[in-house]
Every structure is written in structure tokens, then in C-alpha cells.
């Protein structure tokens, strides 16, 4: 399906949602997948000989170098691709209602962890002569009207980091892109989020934007995790070798408003 045979791909958020879909498709394309998730992986992954994983809390303040070390222990000193998919939501809190713990968790998981992982993976890619990094942001990275200030800031920051990495390493055959999904069915990003604690006033101001996208479900065209996963894996494939520094919405045109 994709030209990934024997390539080593690190995927965060690999146990569910977009990460699980990407892991499954990558394995079917012949890749060696190293998954990272706070949750244990499903048996559909652990039964695969080319899959290894590390249960890891990306919100912790510890270094992520042990992720790369564990991957190299499983598959050797090579990393061809990195998919930074893991993410957490906020409570749609505005700057005037924002709780410190919400801000710190969103920034830690959605921005700090991906940047630290890129820092650890880039030297490996430099030594081997190239690689591809794909970060997952959100419609919230393209707008200020779809989520809270913590999630919005973290995803805007990830877009900026992506562009910086793409330009800095463009002559070393290392590509870096960011995909911005819209609403996706059957994902776990809201797991553990108490929706009754959402900032009601903020949600009210965003209602029209969410309604414009919510009708996709009613029309039967709601995006599924595999729809996002296919874009991610295309960006790892050599057929996308001219694409770097791109910000790519996958959202049924939601980003047009």
C-alpha cells in the first residue's frame, strides 16, 4: 500500500484512534512500528512480529530519550519516520478561566513532547541520511474559534515547530509536515475529559463554527481515524518526497471557514 517495507516508524498515541489506524496500516505496508502510548496496545498490534511498544506518559517532565533507546533496542539504530499523534484536549477554557493544570498538561503532551521527540530522532535521521516527521495538530491550529486557549496555543505552537524543523533540515533529506484533522469519529482524545466542566460561555461563542462541521455526521461523511492515517503514511512514503513544511488540513473543508 505504501513504500514502507522494513522502515522503522515511531508512532505516539498508537493504542487507539488515529494512532492505532496508522500503526495498523504501516504494519500492513511492511514497516516496523514502535508504538508509544499511556494505554496498553491492543492484541491486534502485539500479535504482529514487527511491532514493539513502550507504555509512556508523555505529560511527565522526564526526558523522552528512553523512547528512542527502546526503539533502537527493538529494531536497531535506525528511525525512518516519526508520527507525533498523541494529544489531549482542554476544557474549552478561555484565558480568563484557564486552570494551571489544564494549560500545563496540554502544552506538555501536545507541544513539549513532540518537540522533545523530534530533538531525539533528528540525530538518528542525520546519521542515516534522511527521514520523515509528521506532526498531528488540529483545526484549532488554524483558528481561534474551535477550542480552548490551552489546546489552541499548543497546536499553533506545533505548526510553528514543524515549519522551523522543515526549513532547518531541508538540506539533510529530513522532511517535516503537519496534518490538521477536523472532527474525527471513534477517537479517544476526549477520554478522561469531564464535558460538564467545559467553559459554557466559550462554547457558546464557538457554537456556529462547531455546527458547521457537526452536520458531517448527519450527512454520513464524518471522518474516521483511517482517513487521517492514510495522509500521515503518504507523508512518510518517498512518493511525497517534495512535500516538507506543509500544513495540511484533513477536515472535509472545515478549514475554509
Swiss-Prot record:
It comes from Aspergillus calidoustus. The active site is at residues 151, 155. It comes from the Eukaryota. Its EC number is 1.1.1.-. The keyword Zinc does not apply. It holds the Pfam family adh_short. One of its GO terms (biological process) is terpenoid biosynthetic process. InterPro entries: NAD(P)-bd_dom_sf, SDR_fam, SDR_superfamily_enzyme. The gene is ausX. One of its GO terms (molecular function) is oxidoreductase activity. CDD domains: SDR_c (cd05233). Short chain dehydrogenase; part of the gene cluster that mediates the biosynthesis of calidodehydroaustin, a fungal meroterpenoid. The first step of the pathway is the synthesis of 3,5-dimethylorsellinic acid by the polyketide synthase ausA. 3,5-dimethylorsellinic acid is then prenylated by the polyprenyl transferase ausN. Further epoxidation by the FAD-dependent monooxygenase ausM and cyclization by the probable terpene cyclase ausL lead to the formation of protoaustinoid A. NADP(+) binds at residues 11, 57, 119, 151, 155, 184. Keywords: NADP, Oxidoreductase. This is Short chain dehydrogenase ausX. Belongs to the short-chain dehydrogenases/reductases (SDR) family. Pathway: Secondary metabolite biosynthesis; terpenoid biosynthesis. In A.calidoustus, the austinoid gene cluster lies on a contiguous DNA region, while clusters from E.nidulans and P.brasilianum are split in their respective genomes. Genetic rearrangements provoked variability among the clusters and E.nidulans produces the least number of austionoid derivatives with the end products austinol and dehydroaustinol, while P.brasilianum can produce until acetoxydehydroaustin, and A.calidoustus produces the highest number of identified derivatives.
Amino acid at each position: 500500500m505504501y513504500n514502507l517495507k522494513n522502515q522503522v516508524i515511531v508512532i505516539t498515541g498508537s493504542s487507539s484512534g488515529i494512532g492505532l489506524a496508522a500503526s495498523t496500516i504501516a504494519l500492513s505496508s511492511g514497516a516496523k512500528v514502535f508504538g508509544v502510548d499511556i494505554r496498553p496496545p491492543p492484541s491486534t498490534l502485539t500479535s504482529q512480529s514487527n511491532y514493539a511498544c513502550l507504555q509512556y506518559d508523555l505529560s511527565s517532565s522526564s526526558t523522552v530519550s528512553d523512547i528512542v533507546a527502546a526503539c533502537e533496542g527493538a529494531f536497531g539504530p535506525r528511525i525512518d519516520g516519526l508520527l507525533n499523534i498523541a494529544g489531549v484536549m482542554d476544557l474549552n477554557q478561555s484565558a480568563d478561566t484557564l486552570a494551571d493544570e489544564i494549560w500545563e498538561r496540554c502544552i506538555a503532551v501536545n507541544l513539549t513532547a513532540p518537540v522533545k521527540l523530534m530533538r531525539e530522532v533528528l540525530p538518528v535521521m542525520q546519521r542515516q541520511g534522511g527521514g520523515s516527521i509528521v506532526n498531528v495538530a488540529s483545526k484549532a491550529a488554524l483558528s481561534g474559534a474551535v477550542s480552548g486557549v490551552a489546546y489552541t496555543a499548543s497546536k499553533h505552537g506545533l505548526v510553528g515547530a514543524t515549519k522551523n524543523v522543515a526549513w532547518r533540515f531541508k538540506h539533510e533529506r529530513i522532511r517535516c509536515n503537519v496534518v490538521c484533522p477536523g472532527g474525527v469519529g471513534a477517537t479517544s482524545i476526549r477520554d478522561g475529559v469531564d464535558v460538564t466542566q467545559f467553559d459554557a460561555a466559550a462554547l457558546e461563542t464557538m457554537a456556529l463554527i462547531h455546527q458547521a462541521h457537526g452536520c458531517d455526521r448527519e450527512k454520513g461523511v464524518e471522518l474516521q481515524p483511517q482517513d487521517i492515517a492514510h495522509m500521515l503514511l503518504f507523508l512518510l512514503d518517498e512518493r511525497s518526497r517534495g512535500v516538507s513544511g506543509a500544513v495540511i488540513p484533513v477536515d472535509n473543508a472545515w478549514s475554509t471557514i
